[in-house]
Amino acid sequence: MKIPDNPQIQRFPATTPAPTLWKAVADDGVAIVTNAIPIDTIQRFHADIDNTGHATYLEDYKAFKDKEFPVQAKHASNLVRTSPVFRHEILNTPLIHEICTAAFQHLGDYWLTSSIFRSTNPGNPAQDFHRDALFHPLLQYQSPSAPHLTVSLIIPTTPFTKANGATRVILGSHKWENMTPQNIDALSKDDSVHAEMNAGDIMILHQRTIHAGGEHLPEAKDTRRLLLLLFTSCQLAQLESALALPRPLVESLTPLAQKMVGWRTVKPAGVNVVGLNTYHTGTLEDGLGLRSNQTMAG
C-alpha cells in the first residue's frame, strides 16, 4: 500500500457533473461537493430531529445494551419516519441521485440501505479506521477491481473542523488489497487527511475507502452533527426494513423516495427482466395499488 505525499481531498462545486465527481472518487476514494444542501433545509431538518420527539436512538436499543457507546455521541435512526424534511426534501435531492446514478450505472437500480444522524460532543473519542462496506460482510472478499456495490454520503449539518472530529480519510486506500481488520487497525492517523467541511457539503466515499471520525477535543465546545447515508445496489439487502414504515406515510412520498425505502420494484442491470422486490412476478407498486405524493392525514 502507498500513502500519497501531501494528499488533499478534491473539492467541487455543486454544479459539477456527477460523472466528474465519480471519477474523482474512483481515482482517490473520496470527493467533496461544496454547498450541496441548502442551509435552510438543514435547519428545518434539525428542528424535525430535535423537536418532534419521534427520533429513535441506537443507544436506546435493547439489542445494543451490551455495547459501550461513547457518552458524548448519539446516533438517531428511523429518519424517514421522524423527519418530513428528510423524506420529502433531502431524499429527493437531485444531486444525490445524480451521484448514485453515476456510481451504479453498470449495476442497475440502487436504494437507501441506511440513514443515521450522528452528533458528537467534546471528549468524544476518535473512531477506529474502518470501511463502511463491511455492513455487508461478503463485500470484504471483493478485490479492488470488483464492481463497487455501495457508496456512502457524509453530509455535515454543522461545520467539520480538526478540533471537533472532522472525518479522517486515507486517500487511495480503496485500491489496497489484502487489508485485514488487523492491517486496518495498525494504520496511523498520520496516514490520513482531515475532511474539514461546512454544513451542507457532501463527502462521497467509495465502499473500500478507509476512514474514521476524528477525536472531538474537549476544548472544541461545539456539537458536531452529520447525516450518514448509505446507498447500495438493489442487489444488496437494506439494513433498514421497509416493513417498518406505515403505508399512509409511504404514499405521501414521491415514487423515487418510495423506491429508495424499498416500497417499489427495483431492477438490476443484466438478464433479470422481472426485477427484485416483486409482487407475484409483477411490480410491487402495481400489486399493492400504491399511490404517491398523497397528503398524509394529521
UniProtKB/Swiss-Prot annotation:
Biological processes annotated in GO: terpenoid biosynthetic process
Organism of provenance: Aspergillus calidoustus
Subunit architecture: Homodimer.
Superkingdom of this protein's organism: Eukaryota
Record-given protein name: Iron/alpha-ketoglutarate-dependent dioxygenase ausO
Role noted for this protein: Iron/alpha-ketoglutarate-dependent dioxygenase; part of the gene cluster that mediates the biosynthesis of calidodehydroaustin, a fungal meroterpenoid. The first step of the pathway is the synthesis of 3,5-dimethylorsellinic acid by the polyketide synthase ausA. 3,5-dimethylorsellinic acid is then prenylated by the polyprenyl transferase ausN. Further epoxidation by the FAD-dependent monooxygenase ausM and cyclization by the probable terpene cyclase ausL lead to the formation of protoaustinoid A.
Coiled coil (residue ranges): none
Comment field (misc): In A.calidoustus, the austinoid gene cluster lies on a contiguous DNA region, while clusters from E.nidulans and P.brasilianum are split in their respective genomes. Genetic rearrangements provoked variability among the clusters and E.nidulans produces the least number of austionoid derivatives with the end products austinol and dehydroaustinol, while P.brasilianum can produce until acetoxydehydroaustin, and A.calidoustus produces the highest number of identified derivatives.
EC number: 1.14.-.-
Residues at which Fe cation binds: 130, 132, 211
Keywords: Dioxygenase, Iron, Metal-binding, Oxidoreductase
Record InterPro entries: Phytyl_CoA_dOase-like
Family: Belongs to the PhyH family.
GO molecular function ontology, one term from the record: metal ion binding
Gene behind this protein: ausO
Enzyme class: oxidoreductase
Cofactor: Fe cation
Functional pathway: Secondary metabolite biosynthesis; terpenoid biosynthesis
